[in-house]
């Protein structure tokens, strides 16, 4: 296979040398286009063959040569740009001998520029009849075979550029991703939020339960952590009086890779002063519905075998009620840590001997309920042990004013009425430090600088974090997070 490939590559290099000997630049410069491929198809598709023959408008397009056929003095080809493909009709007597030799020697994958007029073939295909043909970039490697290339899913991720060339669905996914993030910004800016940027390297990792990546700052000779969340710096801005802020940025967690997880991923976090988690629920469903309408024109989408209705209002369910509905176990009752672990064993829920009541409730939910939540559902009231940055619920202090959003059995968002009591926050951090000492390496660190900021006073605040990659998965019907990351993390070959 390698000898065959090298032979093909040598042929292309020989053609490259021939072009250069003739004074042609096989890696040209700027090329002005008048249209993209699908613009022309949409504009002229309604024209009859005869009507198109009467038009004299010249068009100029450019793209990658994807097919080529024909012998003698005429040939057909398809070129592809970001918008799609369009057919070319190239005749020697129209473009001249030299340009036709360039066309004849062109290989699939070459990037070409064409000026011509529109016409429709006998079978009704909108095409460009070339008057000028120019090689813009010589491709020195053959593309994967049309029907046999890039079937290897791992190759698609490792060589995303080939995937984008050969797979229009993949191109569409990443165009949609850009639209999703743009729509997110438009909505929040329209609601008066201020977009900010905060550091990606932290002296103390915080804002989430996760293992961080560690790096070293040579000039300062200190260890730094790639951020595992955006949260704590944005809360400092709330203390500073920036009342509605958001950030869209990369977050890094030194954890496993799966269809739902990548060590480097994109989040949006936002905070609104004088709001609580009920307000943030409403904002979340309106934000996601707005994005769906912008991308799909509808709040009804398809994901896998499911039809998902994103039209507000979404289901709201307390975590204890969700567990009770699924298993019959009632955690509203006063239950000791030992009794909670015994209930877990009885119902086949995997827990460790160090887990408290709140951790057990969460394990019940994750193992028995989470994957059953197909339509958008806000699960709220998480136990205080697993929510160190959320306000306690005033009616039952075992729980917090927190919610997570689940769609198609996956968490898509996490939000709180933010804890702004520095004394309570210190106690929560101390409990987390104890957990870390007992072996939970995802427990929160003590963060004295953040506590000092809270002591100056943070207004009552509602906060939200959304996993952008998972939202893109949902809105593009993509089964794996790697399908929505241009360059996902891969094991070194």
Curated annotation (Swiss-Prot):
PROSITE patterns: AA_TRNA_LIGASE_II (PS50862). Its cofactor is Mg(2+). It catalyses: tRNA(Lys) + L-lysine + ATP = L-lysyl-tRNA(Lys) + AMP + diphosphate. Mg(2+) 2 binds at residue 411. It holds the Pfam family tRNA-synt_2. Binds 3 Mg(2+) ions per subunit. GO terms for biological process: lysyl-tRNA aminoacylation. It comes from the Bacteria. SUPFAM superfamilies: Class II aaRS and biotin synthetases, Nucleic acid-binding proteins. Keywords: Aminoacyl-tRNA synthetase, ATP-binding, Cytoplasm, Ligase, Magnesium, Metal-binding, Nucleotide-binding, Protein biosynthesis. It is an enzyme of class 6 (ligase). GO terms for cellular component: cytosol. The keyword Cell inner membrane does not apply. It is found in: Cytoplasm. Mg(2+) 1 binds at residues 404, 411. Its EC number is 6.1.1.6. One of its GO terms (molecular function) is transferase activity. InterPro entries: Aa-tRNA-synt_II (IPR004364), aa-tRNA-synth_II (IPR006195), aa-tRNA-synth_II/BPL/LPL (IPR045864), Lys-tRNA-ligase_II (IPR002313), Lys-tRNA-ligase_II_bac/euk (IPR034762), Lys-tRNA-ligase_II_N (IPR044136), Lys-tRNA-synth_II_C (IPR018149), NA-bd_OB-fold (IPR012340). Belongs to the class-II aminoacyl-tRNA synthetase family. Homodimer. PANTHER family: LYSINE--TRNA LIGASE, CHLOROPLASTIC_MITOCHONDRIAL, LYSYL-TRNA SYNTHETASE. This is Lysine--tRNA ligase. It comes from Oceanobacillus iheyensis (strain DSM 14371 / CIP 107618 / JCM 11309 / KCTC 3954 / HTE831).
């Amino acid at each position: 296979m390698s000898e065959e490939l090298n032979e093909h590559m040598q042929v292309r290099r020989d053609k490259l040398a021939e072009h250069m000997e003739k004074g042609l630049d096989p890696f040209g410069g700027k090329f002005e286009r008048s249209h993209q491929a699908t613009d022309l198809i949409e504009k002229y598709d309604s024209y009859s063959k005869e009507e198109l023959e009467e038009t004299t408008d010249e068009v100029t397009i450019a793209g990658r040569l994807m097919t080529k056929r024909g012998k003698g003095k005429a040939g057909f080809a398809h070129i592809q740009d970001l918008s799609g493909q369009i057919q070319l009709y190239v005749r020697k007597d129209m473009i001249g001998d030299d340009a036709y030799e360039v066309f004849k020697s062109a290989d699939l994958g070459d990037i070409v520029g064409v000026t011509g007029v529109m016409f429709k073939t006998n079978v009704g295909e909108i095409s460009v009849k070339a008057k000028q043909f120019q090689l813009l970039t010589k491709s020195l490697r053959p593309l994967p075979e049309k029907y046999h290339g890039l079937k290897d899913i791992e190759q698609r991720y490792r060589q995303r550029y080939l995937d984008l060339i050969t797979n229009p669905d993949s191109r569409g996914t990443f165009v949609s991703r850009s639209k999703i993030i743009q729509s997110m910004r438009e909505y929040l800016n329209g609601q008066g939020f201020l977009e900010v940027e905060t550091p990606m390297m932290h002296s103390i990792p915080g804002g989430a339960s996760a293992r961080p990546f560690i790096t070293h700052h040579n000039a300062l000779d200190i260890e730094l952590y790639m951020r595992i969340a955006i949260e704590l710096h944005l809360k400092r801005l709330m203390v500073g009086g920036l009342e509605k802020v958001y950030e869209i940025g990369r977050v890094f967690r030194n954890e496993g890779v799966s269809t739902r997880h990548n060590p480097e991923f994109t989040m949006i976090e936002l905070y609104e002063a004088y709001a609580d988690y009920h307000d943030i629920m409403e904002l979340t469903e309106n934000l996601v519905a707005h994005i769906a309408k912008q991308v799909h024109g509808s709040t009804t989408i398809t994901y896998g075998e499911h039809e998902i209705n994103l039209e507000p209002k979404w289901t709201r369910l307390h975590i204890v009620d969700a567990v009770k509905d699924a298993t019959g176990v009632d955690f509203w009752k006063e239950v000791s840590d030992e009794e909670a672990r015994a209930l877990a064993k009885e119902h086949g829920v995997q827990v460790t001997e160090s887990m408290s009541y709140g951790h057990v409730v969460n394990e019940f939910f994750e193992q028995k309920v989470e994957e059953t939540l197909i339509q958008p559902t806000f699960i709220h009231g998480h136990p205080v042990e697993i929510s160190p940055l959320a306000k306690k619920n005033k009616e039952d202090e075992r729980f917090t004013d927190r919610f997570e959003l689940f769609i198609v059995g996956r968490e898509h968002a996490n939000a709180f009425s933010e804890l702004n009591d520095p004394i309570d926050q210190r106690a929560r951090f101390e409990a987390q430090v104890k957990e870390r000492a007992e072996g939970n390496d995802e427990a929160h660190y003590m963060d004295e600088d953040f506590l000092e900021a809270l002591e100056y006073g943070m207004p009552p605040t509602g906060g939200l974090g959304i996993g952008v990659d998972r939202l893109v998965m949902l809105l593009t019907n993509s089964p794996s997070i790697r399908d929505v990351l241009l360059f996902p993390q891969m094991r070194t070959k």
